[in-house]
Regions:
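N-terminal glycine-/serine-/threonine-rich beta1-alpha1-beta2 phosphate-ribose binding loop
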Residues: 1-116
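C-terminal catalytic/substrate-binding lobe primarily of soluble NAD(P)-dependent oxidoreductases
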Residues: 2-10, 202-365
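Glycine- and other small-residue-rich loops at beta-strand/loop junctions that grip anionic moieties
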Residues: 20, 24, 102-106, 127-132, ...
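Generic secondary-structure signature for well-ordered alpha-helical cores
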Residues: 36-40, 59, 63, 144-149, ...
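Short, ordered loop/turn segments at secondary-structure junctions
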Residues: 49-51, 89, 105, 129-132, ...
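Rossmann-fold NAD(P)-binding glycine/threonine-rich loop
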Residues: 108-120, 129-149, 153-156, 164-167
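A short hydrophobic/small-residue beta-strand
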Residues: 123-125
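Rossmann-like NAD(P)H-binding beta-loop-alpha module
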Residues: 143-144, 151-221
Length: 365
């Protein structure tokens, strides 16, 4: 990894990576908190339908008022500061922006912004996973035709899962399953924005302090977000969904390889090369010990006994047969990690996950 040294070189040459961000909510604010501290990076513009909300979030994340006092995007380039406004189309059309980040959470808006990026030659990071699940493969194809990069957002679980799948395949492993953890119970699938924080087990003050959106938070525990994110993963990795969709089994970090393998091998999956989301709660509502609520995982298969023995010798999290083994990341940092996508695109010309076909979809049952 040498992204930091490349960013430092851009800073030394007074040629920072320039970003225009659309959507100043929770994800965007988390990115802004770290972007202010990142060498070689300039947030040239923050666009939001409510600019005052964006300014308040900039202040809350440690930005001094003079840092976002630019009167226009061109003024931001002259001063090295940040412009706050409400016109995404004008920002995307502006010269000097290297990368556009869509963090709106609005699928039609995200698709519209991505198409504008294709028209104006701007690389795009699609935080808006709802837009990606709906039209990502088409947007990625259009981006390729336009000579730009369309990328999933590092820090969000789909991109982190794509990274794990890529790691496994790049060293010759067959990927048996990949996915994430979440908080799931059948009885909380009926949650609404009015009662979501009761079911989310989050104190009301914590939710308010964190600017947690009740509608978005509901999607995290009613199954919606998990289905959308696994669709994004399938469309970007070639993994295919299970015949009956996601089952949210309660699984600990130490049980990944035992459970998340095909049923023919004693696991819970209907085939290898699929996705699954695991719950941090047992069906009685008690916590799974050593759960993976905020994390991601990949399960791989040993091709022969020699590799199985290596799994045992190096204390990997393997199943009883040592044929299957799991790797996991215990958490994801949302917007705090988004700078990896920005740096990877700008400095390597490489996306952090890109859809390349429609393999999955989301339905309500």
């Amino acid at each position: 990894m040498n992204l930091y040294s490349k960013l430092a070189a851009r800073a030394a040459n007074q040629n920072p990576v320039t970003v225009g961000m659309i959507g100043g909510g929770k994800f965007g604010s988390m990115f802004l908190a770290q972007a202010r501290l990142t060498t070689g990076l300039q947030i040239a513009a923050v666009i939001d339908l409510a600019p005052e909300r964006a300014r308040a979030n900039l202040a809350a994340t440690g930005w001094a008022a003079e840092q976002y006092a630019a009167t226009s995007i061109s003024d931001a380039f002259k001063t090295g500061g940040t412009y706050v406004g409400d016109d995404a189309a004008t920002m995307i059309a502006s010269g000097g922006i290297d990368i556009v980040v869509d963090a709106t959470g609005d699928p039609p808006a995200g698709i519209r912004h991505a198409l504008l990026c294709c028209e104006h030659g701007k690389n795009v990071v699609m935080v808006n996973v709802e837009a990606d699940a709906l039209a990502g493969p088409l947007l990625a194809r259009r981006a390729e035709e336009a000579g730009i990069i369309y990328s999933l957002a590092y820090g969000d679980q789909p991109a982190l899962i794509c990274e794990q799948v890529d790691w496994a395949r790049a060293i010759g492993f067959k990927v048996v399953s990949a996915g994430k953890g979440t908080r799931d119970l059948p009885k909380i699938h009926q949650s609404t924005p009015d009662n979501v924080f009761d079911n989310y087990f989050v104190d009301a003050e914590v939710a308010k302090r964190g600017n947690m959106n009740p509608k978005m938070s509901t999607s995290f525990i009613d199954g919606t977000k998990s289905a959308i994110e696994m669709t994004a993963v399938c469309n970007a990795t070639g993994l295919t969904p299970q015949a009956n969709g996601l089952s949210f089994p309660p699984v600990s970090c130490y049980e990944l390889a035992d459970v998340l393998k095909p049923s023919s091998a004693g696991g819970s999956l209907d085939h290898a090369g699929t996705t699954e989301v695991i719950s941090c709660l047992h069906r009685d509502g008690t916590d799974v010990e050593h759960h993976l609520q905020m994390g991601v995982y990949v399960v791989v298969e040993a091709d022969n006994d020699y590799v199985s023995h290596c799994f045992e010798e190096y204390n990997l999290l393997h199943d009883k047969s040592a044929k299957y083994s799991a790797m996991y990341k215990p958490t994801h940092l949302i917007g705090l990690e988004l700078g990896i996508s920005v740096a990877s695109i700008a400095l390597r010309g490489e996306a952090t996950g890109t859809p390349n076909g429609f393999r999955s979809d989301v339905v309500a049952t």
